């Protein structure tokens, strides 16, 4: 901090590199899902009025919305309701079929992701755990809407698809 500030004040060029040589380290900025997740926080903070503290308490929904945005904006052709999807798999140096940074992968298959609303009673108010449950419910909603109105991995291609309608409802 002080050294860099002094160098800048002296008019010298400062090059800063962030490195972590730990085994398995991957730069999270190359993980589309993580980047969209973080951008999702910006969306939910912008759309939620100030003064309610619903995005800063232990029962916040922001983590779930952010995971949901990540899932929606990284869909690909061929995904189905039972395709199991992780969050942060690149960053954790795990296979795309792994859970990544969440306890369970997102899917409507209850044998893979057994989360239900009742699980919020046992999270201890941990925001990521509550968010994972909320995102699971939103993901289930997406696939029910896709079942009724059609799935489209490109949400901009058809505003009447269940995928686009779900994203519109959530935002």
Region spans (language model):
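Extracellular protease catalytic domains of secreted zymogens
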Residues: 1-171
């Amino acid at each position: 901090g002080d050294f860099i500030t002094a160098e800048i004040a002296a008019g010298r060029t400062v090059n800063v590199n962030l490195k972590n040589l730990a085994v398995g380290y991957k730069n999270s900025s190359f993980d589309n899902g993580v980047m969209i997740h973080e951008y999702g926080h910006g969306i939910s903070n912008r759309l939620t009025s100030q003064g309610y503290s619903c995005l800063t308490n232990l029962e916040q929904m922001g983590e779930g919305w952010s995971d949901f945005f990540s899932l929606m904006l990284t869909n690909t052709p061929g995904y189905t309701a039972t395709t199991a999807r992780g969050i942060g798999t690149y960053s954790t140096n795990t296979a795309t079929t792994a859970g990544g940074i969440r306890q369970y992968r997102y899917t409507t298959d209850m044998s893979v992701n057994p989360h239900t609303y009742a699980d919020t009673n046992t999270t201890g108010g941990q925001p990521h755990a509550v968010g994972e449950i909320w995102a699971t419910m939103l993901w289930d909603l997406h696939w029910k809407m896709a079942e009724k109105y059609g799935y489209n991995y490109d949400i901009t291609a058809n505003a009447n698809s269940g995928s686009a309608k779900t994203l519109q409802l959530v935002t």
